[in-house]
């Protein structure tokens, strides 16, 4: 059922699939070659450079993309990149044609790509953000991502704290923002130590010409340096709860059993909002590091001291699920991140439709987005 053919075939096909237990989402998902995670994360359809740009990479991963077979006209760009000195890796469950063109071949069990990407991310965050922070990575996260933005932490009836939503200017009475304060996010500015309304959120898109951009300025045009972490400027450490789905049984892989809710400690600030209530807030960056189980010295459980710990997110944990040796995960993650650091981002991933042929395929793709 394709809408572009006729609404009759689309409607009847959708009805049939629903009756046999299928789940119909958006047309974006039907082809399974365009990842739904892209508009979920960025609000835009997949927008990538042309294949000729592979030549400019210095580390190239073909993940679920059998380039010689499914992208035959582009295959020569892949080979030419190798002649240019680019290191290549294939990640496919089978020894496909692309695996013959690469320096390394990783073969995770079908459907376990998210666990593999999660472990890659754990290594990258630990070594290039915590142990020896990369100035290039942290500056990139500060300017081009939502990682400095503040998130409200909601206390549940059982006493647990969970991430709720972004803190908005409207939560604090507008902070002088007359235009769409309910759509403007907040962060702390290292220059002043105060809350700032940084450019770039959707609240700037309409009504304020020239301000919908990611220049490192606040809404008044003052230069900012957004604070990524509250580690050195907080009102305390709080245990925040994160869901865990790796224990779900499946015939294709081994479940890694842990509690369905994992608590991890992160630094927080306490703010009194316009309604008089006090809320704890944390940065996206701190929440992300906690989600990946990276130990930052805040105490508490459910964090990994080393890569061999059987803790969600570690190379050892993913080995149980994917079957990929932990040593290979550590090596590829280090090389991928080190190359990106030294070349200012010239590590690339070619993602194929094989990543999208799964329910919850957006989780596969989000893991890769975080790596990049």
Regions found by a protein language model. Give the residues of each.
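Glycine/threonine-rich flexible loop motifs
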Residues: 67-78
């Amino acid at each position: 059922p394709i809408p572009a053919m006729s609404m009759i075939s689309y409607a009847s096909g959708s009805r049939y699939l629903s009756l046999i237990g299928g789940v119909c989402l958006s047309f974006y998902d039907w082809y399974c070659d365009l990842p739904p995670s892209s508009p979920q994360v960025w609000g835009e359809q997949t927008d990538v450079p042309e294949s000729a740009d592979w030549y400019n990479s210095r580390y190239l991963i073909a993940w679920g993309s059998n380039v010689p077979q499914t992208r035959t006209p582009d295959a020569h760009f892949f080979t030419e990149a190798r002649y240019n000195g680019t290191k290549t890796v294939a990640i496919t469950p089978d020894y496909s044609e692309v695996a013959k063109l690469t320096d390394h071949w990783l073969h995770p069990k079908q459907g376990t790509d998210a666990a593999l990407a999660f472990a890659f991310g754990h290594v990258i965050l630990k070594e290039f953000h915590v142990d020896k922070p990369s100035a290039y990575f942290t500056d990139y996260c500060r300017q081009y991502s939502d990682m400095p933005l503040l998130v409200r932490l909601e206390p549940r009836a059982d006493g647990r704290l969970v991430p709720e939503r972004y803190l908005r200017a409207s939560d604090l009475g507008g902070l002088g923002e007359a235009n769409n304060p309910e759509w403007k996010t907040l962060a702390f500015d290292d220059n002043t130590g105060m809350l700032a309304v940084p450019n770039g959120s959707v609240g700037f898109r309409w009504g304020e010409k020239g301000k919908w951009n990611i220049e490192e300025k606040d809404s008044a045009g003052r230069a900012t340096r957004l604070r990524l972490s509250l580690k050195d400027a907080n009102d305390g450490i709080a245990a925040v709860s994160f869901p865990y789905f790796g224990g779900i049984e499946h015939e294709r892989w081994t479940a890694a059993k842990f509690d369905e809710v994992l608590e991890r400690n992160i630094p927080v600030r306490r703010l009194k909002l316009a309604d008089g209530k006090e809320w704890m807030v944390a940065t996206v960056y701190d929440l992300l590091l906690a989600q990946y189980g990276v130990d930052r010295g805040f105490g508490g459980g459910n964090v990994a001291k080393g890569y061999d710990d059987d803790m969600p997110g570690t190379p050892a944990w993913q080995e149980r699920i994917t079957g990929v040796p932990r040593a290979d995960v550590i090596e590829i993650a280090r090389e991928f991140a080190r190359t990106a650091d030294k070349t200012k981002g010239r590590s690339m991933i070619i993602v194929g439709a094989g990543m999208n042929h799964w329910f919850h395929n957006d989780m596969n793709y989000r893991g890769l987005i975080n790596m990049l």
